[in-house]
């Protein structure tokens, strides 16, 4: 198997392809991409056979911005016989994967492929049994073992491969299944909830998303992102010239500042979270987020960058580079990750966590 498949948002195949080509090249792994517009996936075919496995081991999945999932795969299996679709799939995995911990029969995130979902659910049961009988799959699901993926792109046509459980998306199809809360002011609330799932390990939620923390939401109205913070019993400074949802104001946890989010400065020293979903040029948002982090006005930040029509990967990479440079110049050690989330559209979500500062005495360290 010399190919790597990356699932992505339909319409962002070129960005996903540019990113994997760039980041594979930095590891001296070379190949070519196969891209079909609006297909929801990209194939990176390595020149060296063993490089596909090496790439999915060595390239941290969380460093990929536009990929929802990453797996090694072989050639496309075409025209699987309806009377026996299982044998060719088992044959492709034999000698390649042993004692995998999970099976996922998936489809790309397109309207055409979603019509295959019902078939995938039914097909999973007999395929799982066959893989267990051949010792390709363990008798019980094991979260620390490789995952077998079967990706159907059309009836009777699928890619078969595997991913590593310590370097992939834990979600089926790479998509967290979140339910829209009926009392939330806007659907944008799901962006921040998904960001928490993607960027913050579940066993750290109590520590980093805890009750009683102070947060600032820039460009808050009507309160979709503020809702997530309030739900976690935080005290929130909501900054926006517009009106906040009355249901949030009634909680007593929200202070509404009718001000420009780009000029607002925190009124207190113990702000932990900064969140921002303002419609503005990426460079302007990045610069202001850097101000907050360098000045020690917050510990962690989650913000969205709205993407231009062209050279979207290049634009994101440039802004992340500028942010990294600003933090380094300010003596800040930080973790920076970006991801185009399922609930994002023409945008990506960035998470920054300050680890420590080389310069003592900042506001958040007193």
UniProtKB/Swiss-Prot annotation:
One of its GO terms (cellular component) is cytoplasm. The active site is at residue 306. Its EC number is 2.1.1.186. Pfam families: FtsJ, RlmM_FDX, RLMM_N. The keyword Magnesium does not apply. It catalyses: cytidine(2498) in 23S rRNA + S-adenosyl-L-methionine = 2'-O-methylcytidine(2498) in 23S rRNA + S-adenosyl-L-homocysteine + H(+). It is an enzyme of class 2 (transferase). NCBIfam families: PRK11760.1. Monomer. It is found in: Cytoplasm. The lineage of its organism: Bacteria, Pseudomonadati, Pseudomonadota, Gammaproteobacteria, Enterobacterales. Catalyzes the 2'-O-methylation at nucleotide C2498 in 23S rRNA. One of its GO terms (biological process) is methylation. InterPro entries: RlmM_FDX, RlmM_THUMP-like, RNA_MeTrfase_FtsJ_dom, rRNA_MeTrfase_M, SAM-dependent_MTases_sf. Keywords: Cytoplasm, Methyltransferase, rRNA processing, S-adenosyl-L-methionine, Transferase. One of its GO terms (molecular function) is S-adenosylmethionine-dependent methyltransferase activity. This is Ribosomal RNA large subunit methyltransferase M.
């Amino acid at each position: 198997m010399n190919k790597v498949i990356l699932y992505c948002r339909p319409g962002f195949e070129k960005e996903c392809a540019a990113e994997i080509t760039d980041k594979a090249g930095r590891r001296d792994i070379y190949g070519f991409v196969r891209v079909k517009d609006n297909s929801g996936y990209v194939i990176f075919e390595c020149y060296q056979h063993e490089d596909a496995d090496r790439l999915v081991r060595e390239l941290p999945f969380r460093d990929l911005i536009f990929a929802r999932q990453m797996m090694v795969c072989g050639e496309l299996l075409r025209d699987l016989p309806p009377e026996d679709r299982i044998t060719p799939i088992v044959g492709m995995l034999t000698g390649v994967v042993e004692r995998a911990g999970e099976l996922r029969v998936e489809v790309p995130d397109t309207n055409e492929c979603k019509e295959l979902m019902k078939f995938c659910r039914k097909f999973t049961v007999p395929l799982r049994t066959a893989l267990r009988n051949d010792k390709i799959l363990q008798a019980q699901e094991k979260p620390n073992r490789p995952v077998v993926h079967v990706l159907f792109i059309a009836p009777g046509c699928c890619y078969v491969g595997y991913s590593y459980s310590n370097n992939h998306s834990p979600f089926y199809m790479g998509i967290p299944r979140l339910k829209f809360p009926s009392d939330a002011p806007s659907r944008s609330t799901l962006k921040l909830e998904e960001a928490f799932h993607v960027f913050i390990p579940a066993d750290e939620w109590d520590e980093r998303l805890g009750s009683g923390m102070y947060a600032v939401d820039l460009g808050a109205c009507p309160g979709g992102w503020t809702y997530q913070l309030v739900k976690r019993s935080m005290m929130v400074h909501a900054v926006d010239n517009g009106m906040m949802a009355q249901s949030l104001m009634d909680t007593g946890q929200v202070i509404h500042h009718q001000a420009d989010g780009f000029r607002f400065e925190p009124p207190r020293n113990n702000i932990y979270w900064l969140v921002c979903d303002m419609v503005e040029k990426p460079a302007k948002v990045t610069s202001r987020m850097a101000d907050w982090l360098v000045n020690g006005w917050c510990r962690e930040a989650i913000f969205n960058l709205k993407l231009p029509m062209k050279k979207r990967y290049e634009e994101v990479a440039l802004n992340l580079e500028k942010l990294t440079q600003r933090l380094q110049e300010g003596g800040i050690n930080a973790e920076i990750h970006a991801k185009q989330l399922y609930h994002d559209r023409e945008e990506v979500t960035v998470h920054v966590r300050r680890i420590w500062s080389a310069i003592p005495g900042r506001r958040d360290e007193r």
